[in-house]
Amino acid sequence: MSQTHRILLLNGPNLNMLGAREPKHYGSISLTSIEEKIQTLATQHNVKVECFQANSEEKLINKIHESFQQVDFILINPAAYTHTSVALRDALLAVSIPFVEIHLSNVHKREPFRHHSYFSDVAEGVICGLGAKGYEFAFLFAMDYLAKK
């Protein structure tokens, strides 16, 4: 890659509690550990990654808006907002930044209300059920996607 690409890693509500929160579904790794792994990959690929987590829909939307023409790709785990937030979906569509939707657990093996996503049909891809590795796979996909641009 001739230029340094910029990636935004967004994590939604309650993901700051990873490691302690329902390890049966989400694993025992912390969000900090996931972010550190992505930063290591970013260094290896000469890419800048900004990590941001919020429990507030407003803060996530504002971060997406701030990314307009500043970020080349978004990796997002919308968490519970996956199933409820038209506003986050609209923010992503407004900035026209390609993104991958990530979920630690396999949402299709869980409660029926978790089966619907407001993001999947407008995402470049969706990764779910692969635990923390899903973030790494999403990052590598973003690298491939950006290399082809």
Curated annotation (Swiss-Prot):
Catalytic activity, as annotated: 3-dehydroquinate = 3-dehydroshikimate + H2O
Enzyme class at the top of the EC tree: lyase
Residues reported to bind substrate: 77, 83, 90, 104-105, 114
Site annotation Transition state stabilizer: residues: 21
Keywords: Amino-acid biosynthesis, Aromatic amino acid biosynthesis, Lyase
Pathway: Metabolic intermediate biosynthesis; chorismate biosynthesis; chorismate from D-erythrose 4-phosphate and phosphoenolpyruvate: step 3/7
Enzyme Commission numbers on file: 4.2.1.10
PROSITE patterns, alphabetized: DEHYDROQUINASE_II (PS01029)
GO biological process: amino acid biosynthetic process; aromatic amino acid family biosynthetic process; chorismate biosynthetic process; quinate catabolic process
Active site feature: 26 (proton acceptor), 103 (proton donor)
GO molecular function: 3-dehydroquinate dehydratase activity
Described function: Catalyzes a trans-dehydration via an enolate intermediate.
NCBIfam families: aroQ (TIGR01088), PRK05395.1-1 (NF003804), PRK05395.1-2 (NF003805), PRK05395.1-3 (NF003806), PRK05395.1-4 (NF003807)
Subunit (UniProt): Homododecamer.
Database matches in HAMAP family: AroQ
Family stated for the protein in its record: Belongs to the type-II 3-dehydroquinase family.
Protein name: 3-dehydroquinate dehydratase
